[in-house]
Amino acid sequence: MTDSRQKVLIAGGSSGMGLALARRCLDDGAQVTIVGRDEERLARACEQLGRPGRLRALAADISREEQVASLFERAGALDHIACTAADIQGAYALLPDLDMAAAQRAVASKVFGPLYLARHGAARLAPGGSLTFTSGIAAYRPQPRGAVVAAINAALEGLVRALAVELAPLRVNAVSPGWVDTPIWTHVAGDRKDEALQSMARRLPAGRVGRAGDIADAIAFLMANTFTTGTVLHVEGGHRLA
């Protein structure tokens, strides 16, 4: 996918899919910058990943534009930007119970965050560079309690298509994960996380739910494939067929 001459910035790189992507890029020889809000979590991620000569961590909240602008001043030149960050805590609720502040935080992290990354990061990308974001199955298979996340994912995919045109020849794509066993599921299902994932695994044609590495592999593919832009790559075990 990449080599030691390529520089990859991963927003959300301290856990879950972003951490798996950081590991994948490091294994491929890239120089990696992981970004997150929590400095302690970033430090733990760096310990897990190793590779101190090719890995650095920068703290920033991508839902705040001034922090994104500062982030890219510190990051320097890049080849690829990827974003797996999402703050959906409290955003899964029936409408009468929905905390609108939580809904706004979710929109800020998954729509405005990518918009800020593109606005301030595109100029830092080398020719042939790419931006890759993560939407999700909720845009295609919404469920009760999931209205906010369904709308956010659909909005992000619209943004990806528009940015692919506006920022060309830079490439802009999205990966749409299905149900993936990552820490974010604690915010979705709470104590029922394991039960919910096992139930979904029985429904899916693939016979299992996703792993963080499945999404990392898909993002790595989009980084490498120079003839793919404005595309949503579905990595969901056949969920849209189930």
How should each PLM-predicted stretch be described?
Residues 14-16:
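Conserved glycine-rich cofactor-binding loop
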Residues 157, 166-182, 228-235:
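Conserved Rossmann-fold SDR core element
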Residues 49-66:
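Rossmann-fold cofactor-recognition segment
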Residues 87, 97-100, 104-107, 111, ...:
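Catalytic loop of short-chain dehydrogenase/reductase
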Residues 208-235, 240:
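C-terminal substrate-recognition "lid" of short-chain dehydrogenase/reductases
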Residues 28-44:
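Conserved glycine-rich Rossmann-like NAD(P)H-binding loop of the short-chain dehydrogenase/reductase
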Residues 193-214:
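Catalytic Tyr-x(3-8)-Lys segment
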Residues 92-95, 99-104, 196, 200:
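Substrate-binding pocket helix/loop in short-chain dehydrogenase/reductase
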